[in-house]
Swiss-Prot record:
Bias kind Acidic residues: ranges: 606-615
Gene responsible for this protein: dnaK
Residue ranges of the TM segments: none
Protein name per the record: Chaperone protein DnaK
Organism: Lactiplantibacillus plantarum (strain ATCC BAA-793 / NCIMB 8826 / WCFS1)
Function: Acts as a chaperone.
Keyword flag Ribonucleoprotein: no
Length: 622
């Protein structure tokens, strides 16, 4: 039976998390390993797919490992080629979502079909559509896509809905950066503005350390580690660890023995990275986040002094230099009351509760991050919906023809902020045809934009004279067709079945190993205690099972395992009965001996009393 719960998923660049509403509180669902976040890593090995911690652990030795795929969501034509097969970012993301769905179902004890998934506030339409496609491939109905900073504010504001506050959410994750300004009052979360950079995050901070290590090693040893894939993965792991360590200590030791080899033998990397040096290396990245903060405040028509609360979200906000910079820019001490790795998933779970009706009196009013419009005469970008407009929203405008007797108009839909169409991102094109012949400027063409609650765009063009209408739901240029999505859903399900089958086979082989071991032990214990025929029967069954195991014949293993199991159980019962009989015989002999001893004392009924008397005497002696 499917659960009516809607899980909240933070599909992150480096780590993901999932939460569910229990009672009135959102709760993180832990991974099978007990972790509270899932590394957004997928590995392929011999046709098997691994996701999460296990995939991340073997990344050094397995080149078929994919990480930070979120950076490529919505990217036209981008694919990763693994073991002779191409995968889109949607498919890789779907594998992560499928894994999350699986352990969430184990926790809830029900099938999970619905989810709220978060995206960076500055994700464009193509990236949002790709996220929805990934959910569909994973077998999840994405009930709502919400912006990550908005989700963080939901987690923060759940128990503070009686306050009127202006909140700045500074969200620096593994691969993306967002800043949003929200107003919270009477249970309404209204997003006033949003800004950011979808290609800036903790990965870039790691890269600065990696570059520093590579340059230093090259200067000392004349070896370029950036050309060595395995060394590079070790450097990445060491850089990430050093970055995390420097959030708590002033210097971090980096020790990588046998990182390479030179003419005189193995080479080792041993160095110390101080927090001061780290701050120097990454100062430009921290500074890069300042402009979006200023722009978001400007778009919300606020100054830093108008802010009541500053929330830091995303694991990279643990970096002390980031915290200091945000506090300096805003003049406010940042709020650390929420775990920055978990807030987004918790907020998504709250939104799930809003949708199911479990959370009352909370309304989320999100915004579109970029302006939307069409190309008009002269290649001009004419905006119909300005950025930071609250969604869902609808806007229409009447246009006309540019030439006499023009039979059709091309509707070129764009997203962006530049005045010329060529400088903005194309979302789609369609044509309205069969316009009756008329002088230029006479036909009335109504163009209407609709943005739904997920930020997905629908555009229509209607000839007011004939009522002829043409519509388009914007799919990104990298979006997948329904057929492609259906095929990927099918493949994902097939892989799920294959993975399940593979696990069952491994479990069966383990059971067979254990049974053969138990049989050998039982036969040894039964030596000389059962007939030769029974021993032969057991040995034959054991050998038949061993042969099936050696042949890797799954069906035979199942059948022979059941046969041997029955024989071993029967023998074990016999062994137990023999032990009981032997114990009974021994017990009888002991009773007779005790009875004879008592008779010699001339007592008729003193066996028990005799025992007690002896104990009492012992007590008296003490």
């Amino acid at each position: 039976m499917a659960s009516n719960k809607i899980i909240g998923i933070d599909l992150g660049t480096t780590n993901s998390a999932v939460a569910v509403l229990e009672g009135n509180e959102p709760k993180i669902i832990t991974t099978p390993e007990g972790g509270r976040t899932v590394p957004s890593v997928v590995a392929f090995k011999d046709g098997e797919t691994q996701v999460g911690e296990v995939a991340k652990r073997q990344a050094i030795t397995n080149p078929n490992t994919v990480a930070s795929i979120k950076r490529h969501m919505g990217e036209a034509g981008y694919k990763v080629s693994i073991e002779g097969k191409d995968y889109t970012p949607q498919q890789i993301s779907a594998m992560i979502l499928q894994y999350i769905k699986g352990f969430a179902e184990d926790y809830l004890g029900d099938t999970v079909e619905k989810a709220v998934v978060t995206v960076p506030a500055y994700f464009n339409d193509a990236q949002r559509q790709a996220t929805k496609d990934a959910g569909k491939i994973a077998g999840l109905n994405i009930e709502r896509i919400i912006n990550e900073p908005t989700a963080a504010a939901l987690a923060y504001g759940l128990d503070k809905t009686d306050k009127d506050e202006k909140i700045l959410v500074y969200d620096l994750g593994g691969g993306t950066f967002d800043v949003s300004i929200l107003e919270l009052g009477d249970g309404v979360f209204e997003v006033l503005s949003t800004n950011g950079d979808t290609h800036l995050g903790g990965d870039d901070f790691d890269q600065k350390i990696i570059d520093w290590l590579v340059d230093g090693f090259k200067a000392d040893n004349g070896v370029d580690l950036s050309k060595d894939k395995m060394a590079l993965q070790r450097l990445k792991d060491a850089a990430e660890k050093a970055k995390k360590d420097l959030s708590g200590v002033s210097e971090a030791q980096i020790s990588l023995p046998f990182i390479s080899a030179g003419a005189s033998g193995p080479l080792h990397l041993e160095t110390t990275l101080t927090r001061a040096k780290f701050n120097e290396l990454t100062a430009d990245l921290v500074e890069k986040t300042r402009i979006p903060v200023e722009n978001a405040l400007k778009d919300a028509d606020l100054s830093a002094s108008d802010l009541d609360v500053v929330i830091l979200n995303g694991g990279s906000t643990r970096i002390p230099a980031v915290q200091e910079a945000v506090e300096k820019w805003t003049g406010k001490e940042s709020n650390h009351s929420i775990n920055p790795d978990e807030a987004v998933a918790l907020g998504a779970a709250v939104q799930g509760g809003v949708i199911t009706g479990d959370v009352k009196d909370v309304v989320l009013l999100d915004v579109t991050p970029l302006s939307l419009g069409i190309e008009t005469m002269g290649g001009v970008f004419t905006k119909l919906i300005d950025r930071n407009t609250t969604i869902p929203t609808s806007k229409s405008q009447v246009f006309s023809t540019a030439a006499d007797n023009q039979p059709a108009v091309d509707i070129h839909v764009l997203q962006g902020e530049r005045p010329m169409a060529a400088d903005n991102k194309t979302l789609g094109r369609f044509q309205l045809t069969d316009i009756p012949a008329a002088p230029r400027g006479v036909p009335q063409i109504e163009v209407k934009f609709d943005i739904d609650k997920n930020g997905i765009v629908n555009v229509s063009a209607k000839d007011m004279g004939t009522n002829k209408e043409q519509k388009i739901t914007i799919k990104s240029s990298s979006g997948l067709s329904d057929d492609e999505i259906d095929q990927m859903v099918k493949e994902a399900k097939e892989n799920e079945e294959a993975d399940k089958k593979r696990k069952e086979e491994v479990d069966l082989k383990n059971e067979v190993d254990q049974l053969i071991f138990t049989t050998d032990k039982t036969l040894k214990d039964l030596e000389g205690k059962v007939s030769e025929d029974e021993v032969k029967k057991a040995k034959d069954a054991r050998d038949a099972l061993k042969k099936a195991q050696d042949d890797n014949n799954i069906d035979e293993m199942k059948a022979k395992k059941d046969d041997l199991n029955k024989i071993v159980q029967d023998l074990s019962v016999k062994l137990y009965q023999q032990a009981q009989e032997a114990q009974g015989a021994q017990g009888g002999a002991d009773s007779n001996a005790a009875g004879n001893a008592n008779s010699a004392k001339g007592s008729d009924d003193n066996t028990v009393d005799g025992d007690f008397e002896d104990l009492d005497k012992d007590k008296d002696k003490k």
